[in-house]
């Protein structure tokens, strides 16, 4: 009996980020594929025009945890949904990206939350 797509989607929907990461790694090993993003070539001419466009995706980088590391770990967990150990490892390994590919409003909100917790944050 085959498993329906809806059943698979429901199972994936209920997984944590860590479980999804392990699932992707298992797919990579089982089928010999890579989950890396495909690079898309930009326009051949008009490089200056591309630079003039307003940036739409931002990366929030935790530059330094600061003195109140516990509050920063809590803020990272709240923003990312990571578990305690993963959030602590991210904070201990600063500078590291906390959120990637988010819009300006989400980046500013994440920056404010982390700075309120005592961290030094960069938005790139």
From Swiss-Prot:
Any one GO molecular function term: mRNA binding
Coiled-coil annotated residue ranges, if any: none
Domain of life of the source: Bacteria
InterPro entries in the cross-refs: Ribosomal_bL12 (IPR000206), Ribosomal_bL12_C (IPR013823), Ribosomal_bL12_C/ClpS-like (IPR014719), Ribosomal_bL12_oligo (IPR008932), Ribosomal_bL12_oligo_N_sf (IPR036235)
Reported function: Forms part of the ribosomal stalk which helps the ribosome interact with GTP-bound translation factors. Is thus essential for accurate translation.
PANTHER family referenced in this protein's UniProt entry, alphabetically: 39S RIBOSOMAL PROTEIN L12, LARGE RIBOSOMAL SUBUNIT PROTEIN BL12M
UniProt-recorded name of the protein: Large ribosomal subunit protein bL12
Gene name per UniProt: rplL
């Amino acid at each position: 009996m085959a498993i329906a797509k809806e059943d698979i989607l429901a199972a994936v929907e209920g997984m944590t980020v860590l479980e999804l990461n392990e699932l992707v790694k298992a797919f990579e090993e089982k089928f010999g594929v890579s989950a890396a993003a495909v690079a898309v070539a930009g326009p051949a001419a008009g490089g200056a025009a591309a630079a003039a466009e307003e940036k739409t995706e931002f990366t929030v980088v935790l530059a330094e945890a600061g003195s109140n590391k516990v509050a920063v770990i809590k803020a990272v967990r709240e923003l990312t949904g990571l578990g305690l150990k993963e959030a602590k490892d991210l904070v201990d390994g600063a500078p590291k990206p906390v959120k990637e590919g988010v819009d300006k409003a989400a980046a500013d909100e994440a920056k404010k939350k982390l700075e309120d917790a005592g961290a030094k944050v960069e938005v790139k």
